[in-house]
UniProtKB/Swiss-Prot annotation:
<keyword id="KW-0800">Toxin</keyword>
<keyword id="KW-1015">Disulfide bond</keyword>
<feature type="propeptide">
    <location>
        <begin position="24"/>
        <end position="48"/>
    </location>
</feature>
<comment type="function">
    <text>This toxin causes paralysis and death to sheep blowflies. It may inhibit voltage-gated calcium channels.</text>
</comment>
<dbReference type="GO" id="GO:0005576">
    <property type="term" value="C:extracellular region"/>
</dbReference>
<comment type="similarity">
    <text>Belongs to the neurotoxin 12 (Hwtx-2) family. 03 (juruin) subfamily.</text>
</comment>
<keyword id="KW-0732">Signal</keyword>
<feature type="signal peptide">
    <location>
        <begin position="1"/>
        <end position="23"/>
    </location>
</feature>
<protein>
    <recommendedName>
        <fullName>U1-theraphotoxin-Ct1a</fullName>
    </recommendedName>
</protein>
<keyword id="KW-0528">Neurotoxin</keyword>
<dbReference type="GO" id="GO:0090729">
    <property type="term" value="F:toxin activity"/>
</dbReference>
<dbReference type="InterPro" id="IPR012625">
    <property type="entry name" value="Hwtx-2-like"/>
</dbReference>
<dbReference type="Pfam" id="PF08089">
    <property type="entry name" value="Toxin_20"/>
</dbReference>
<keyword id="KW-0964">Secreted</keyword>
């Protein structure tokens, strides 16, 4: 019984992560607007804590996604799912 519960919880977690990633991708492609709340999950935005905390220290075209010691991306860059995206 514990095994089935664990499998169910892990499956739900994977589905939530997949749905959030798909919503993020659609937002980047401008298919949905960030203020769209009809998706079932709130879209990820700049105010979420983990947005730039993963690896926004990556450099894109020689420039960092965010300045050293800064909490948010700057210079027209946005950190999305471990990738630097030009806004």
């Amino acid at each position: 019984m514990k095994t089935f519960t664990l499998i169910a919880i892990l499956t739900c977690a994977v589905l939530v992560i997949f749905h959030a990633a798909a919503a993020e991708e659609l937002e980047v492609q401008d298919v949905i607007q960030p203020e769209d709340t009809l998706t079932g999950l709130a879209t990820l935005d700049e105010d979420r804590l983990f947005e730039c905390s993963f690896s926004c220290d990556i450099k894109k075209n020689g420039k960092p996604c965010k300045g050293s010691g800064e909490k948010k991306c700057s210079g027209g860059w946005r950190c999305k799912m471990n990738f630097c995206v030009k806004v």
